[in-house]
A protein has these predicted regions:
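Acceptor-substrate binding/catalytic loop of class I
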Residues: 60-75, 96-97
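Conserved beta-strand signature within the Rossmann-like core of class I S-adenosyl-L-methionine
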Residues: 47-60
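Short alpha-helix
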Residues: 68-84, 88-91
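Conserved residues in the N-terminal Rossmann fold of short-chain dehydrogenase/reductase
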Residues: 7, 28
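A short, conserved alpha-helix within the catalytic core of class I
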Residues: 31-45
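Core SAM-dependent methyltransferase catalytic element
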Residues: 92-120
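A short acidic, Gly/Pro-enriched loop at the edge of an enzyme's catalytic core
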Residues: 11, 15-25
Length: 120
């Protein structure tokens, strides 16, 4: 158990800096590089949890990011993990804090059985 730092260019096309390592949890906030989504799922240990939140279409009205390349389409996070992870929770909508934005939030678990949310 523990935490560490890894400095890596995740968008440069180089080798995946985490190799074959598996993690109990992967957390992503305010970041979207679509080619990484399958690798993030692959990085989960059995029973591991992915928590992902980033901006979605509609955020243009609140400011940046406003480029469609950096905004999730409706249901895009769900589709990215469908058939690979068990969905624990999903939200898509407007948040007021820390500043108004349109976001998608996903919590999903690796495994083929029911996810026991009381044991975490």
């Amino acid at each position: 158990m523990g935490c560490g730092d890894i400095a890596a260019d995740l968008e440069g096309g180089g080798p995946w800096p985490l190799g074959g390592r598996r993690f109990e949890g992967v957390v992503v906030t305010n970041y979207l590089h679509r080619p990484l989504l399958p690798r993030l799922v692959d990085s989960l240990a059995p029973g591991g949890v992915l928590i992902y939140e980033t901006f979605a279409r509609g955020n243009e009205r609140f400011g940046r990011p406003s480029n469609p390349a950096f905004l999730l389409a409706p249901g895009e996070l769900l589709e990215a993990v469908r058939g690979r992870l068990q969905i624990v929770a999903y939200e898509h909508g407007v948040v007021a804090r820390p500043k108004p934005a349109v976001v998608q939030r996903l919590c999903a678990a690796a495994g083929d059985g029911l996810f026991d949310i009381t044991s975490r």
